[in-house]
Amino acid sequence: MSGPKWHSPITQIHNHTVLFRAGGFVVATYGPMMAIALFFGFAQGAWFLEYSGGDGGWMARFSLLAVFPAVVIGCRLASLMLDLDELRKNPLRAILKPGFMLQGGIIGGASAMLVGASMKGIDPLLLLDTAAFTMPLSEALGRLGCHIYGCCWGRPTHSVPGLRYRDRDSKVLRCRPELHNVPLHAAPLYTSLVSLGLLAAFTMMLEMPRNLGVYAATYLCVHPILRFGLEHFRDDDRGRLGSLTHSKMYAILLFIAGCAVFYVSGSHGVLAQFDPSVSFWSTAREQFWPLF
């Protein structure tokens, strides 16, 4: 007996890669999902900085004008590092081919935050904390986009109910057509759930006594550990160095950076300030939304 019809759009959303077509112009569902992730991430950043005694309006503007391009460039450059052969043979095709890598975006976004801290005269640990606080929600929403687009797909599985991709437009079937209708681990959804757990932990830490830099250090140390575990479910062996995938190598670098930030945070010894009266929704409405 077939299940109820109402849940089909939810359970089969990964088989609706294309949102709409207009002539030769294609809009993938991934695009709006990433826009939602970025909107909430940048709105969160404006709120967190204002909550911490900073200028939320400046954070909103800086996010759109500097952090956003830095994240996109970082994601794209990290992805291109895995296509060096094609980049040498056909540079234009390699550059125009879609592909992004989260760890590159983390590096790009953190670099932009450090530049912004220098320009604005803000403690760099505060801006790194701001970036770190936005990451779990942004990644949770962004991985839903990956789930729908069919990128970052999981390994074949028979131990748990798997996702079956049937939409020929999905990236997994364009890259690996033999995986059509094969049950796969829902790797992007696993990441979304783990990210929501990290968001819950970060939210509980908000009013706890802590030094500046603790959020950034925690994210940079915890994210790689989680990524190492999740790599077991992903079907991506590109850029291997021995037993390490490219994602694991980036994760090791981020973990080392996190340990360094923990050291600086402890040496710095500046307690984080916060104002519980600052509302996320009012900050988003007053500081972020008017920019659109």
Model-based region annotation:
Residues 1-292:
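Hydrophobic, membrane-interfacing alpha helices
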